[in-house]
């Protein structure tokens, strides 16, 4: 252990001397009260440390002690259902120790070292094992089986393994004979957060992450292992949209990072998720969720660490063979933390004061997403999907964080303040948003849901584009001056907007819409468009066509429960054909 002294303090940045022999990214304890920090710069025997806690009251001359290891997370049974701060300190444990406020320098282990878990071995003495091989399981929650793996860099032969029973996370459960002698395996692994966990190879992102949200799934889909950016100004619905994805996405595990956002938003998640049922298992959603809360009133430097903490936990569950969805809300606050630290370090600023390395740091984070073949003999296909919210000041999408994120992310959900003001939620602007995964996941939709899915999607997008062009004319001369076929187009596009794209997150039925229901809703609305256009060509009255009785039922389609939907939608389609034919007589 190396001990130095503080010589300079600048907010969350501290400079100390006598630190020769330490390494970049090594964890240190700063001051007499032992604040947690990380070395970010070394020059001679002088070290620059970013401190993850409030530095008020620390003075020059106090000690800095190295810990000998990098900023790392503890990975093992007990992670699920937990709420951590940005450096993986369990907030519920801190509350039981110190009350409602987090004292500085508190040292609480991330995983409970006393609690015992029921371990069931799946490997035997004499088995050859490599990094990533599963040697046993623990039923961590009612929804998730926690698979105990050999650490990534270990390989050899199992010399001994414990029998089924209760053990804590630090007890030795197996001994492996390696080239370097006998090494022990515990249920807990420790992994540095800035180093990605290994995998065998990356796979094509050709399976969609079904979210149950019509705008995202049908029009701007994200693939499992994909990256998505969600920029939007204040009040445009970023947090509710992220929470909807966390609730209903068909991932096995959800890691939700509240990075520099309001504490009330994390409170919402904490109060709602235990009450909500997972549609796949019927268990509370909290059973498959990890929360990392680094709210706006917590120290700025810890924001820089919290996204790495979150993605490392996500990669750990990916290695077990699970599909993981990671929500980062919001990456702008993380970038602002980098800007502040860069300013304290007196580095040359880039655009708008952000550091010149902003783009590479964002890329390092997003590139840890992906659908992969895991290491180990089980060779499972698993994924980490990253959805990053971006909060550009004033909704200005030309600012550096948004622009650099767009270069990396393959899906762009542009949240629009004007749509939010009109109470159109989710306020995803269908003209500005895009997905680069549509080509790769078309086969899945066509084979699993409907062979004409891509054609329907393209037709609907063309209708919405046409409506945008016609609206410019309507604002000048009014809708009555338009050709009759364009009035039907406007009406069909309005139904797409109001009856398909709008979705009520607080309605028990509409909050989640299955892929087959989405497909049938879209098909029915487009059936109205084609049938009405053909009836119009046969001489039907335009006023009758835009005021059909079935229009009311089309608007209520989204509120039909899944088990009744198929029969009712067939009836609606028959009525569309019948009423359009009657309008032409």
Swiss-Prot record:
Q: Which GO terms describe its biological process?
A: proton motive force-driven plasma membrane ATP synthesis
Q: Which GO terms describe its molecular function?
A: ATP binding; proton-transporting ATP synthase activity, rotational mechanism; proton-transporting ATPase activity, rotational mechanism
Spell out the GO cellular component terms annotated for this protein, sorted alphabetically and separated by semicolons: plasma membrane; proton-transporting two-sector ATPase complex, catalytic domain
SUPFAM superfamilies with a match to the protein in the record: C-terminal domain of alpha and beta subunits of F1 ATP synthase, N-terminal domain of alpha and beta subunits of F1 ATP synthase, P-loop containing nucleoside triphosphate hydrolases
Q: Where in the cell is the protein located?
A: Cell membrane
CDD domains assigned to the protein according to its UniProt record, in alphabetical order: ATP-synt_V_A-type_alpha_C, ATP-synt_V_A-type_alpha_N, V_A-ATPase_A
Q: Kindly list the positions annotated as binding ATP.
A: 232-239
Q: Which Pfam families does the record match to this protein?
A: ATP-synt_ab, ATP-synt_ab_N, ATP-synt_ab_Xtn, ATP-synt_VA_C
Which keywords describe this protein according to UniProt? ATP synthesis, ATP-binding, Cell membrane, Hydrogen ion transport, Ion transport, Membrane, Nucleotide-binding, Translocase, Transport
UniProt topology in membrane = Peripheral membrane protein
Reaction(s) catalysed by this chain's protein: ATP + H2O + 4 H(+)(in) = ADP + phosphate + 5 H(+)(out)
Entry-linked Gene3D superfamilies: 2.40.30.20, 2.40.50.100, Bovine Mitochondrial F1-atpase, Atp Synthase Beta Chain, Chain D, domain 3, P-loop containing nucleotide triphosphate hydrolases
InterPro entries found in the cross-reference section: ATP-synt_VA_C, ATP-synth_a_Xtn, ATP_synth_asu-like_sf, ATP_synth_asu_arc, ATPase_a/bsu_AS, ATPase_F1/V1/A1_a/bsu_N, ATPase_F1/V1/A1_a/bsu_N_sf, ATPase_F1/V1/A1_a/bsu_nucl-bd
Q: What is its EC number?
A: 7.1.2.2
Assembly mode: Has multiple subunits with at least A(3), B(3), C, D, E, F, H, I and proteolipid K(x).
**Chain's role:** Component of the A-type ATP synthase that produces ATP from ADP in the presence of a proton gradient across the membrane. The A chain is the catalytic subunit.
Task: State the family named in the UniProt similarity comment for this chain.
Answer: Belongs to the ATPase alpha/beta chains family.
**Name of the protein in question:** A-type ATP synthase subunit A
| Species this chain originates from | Methanosphaera stadtmanae (strain ATCC 43021 / DSM 3091 / JCM 11832 / MCB-3)
UniProt gene name: atpA
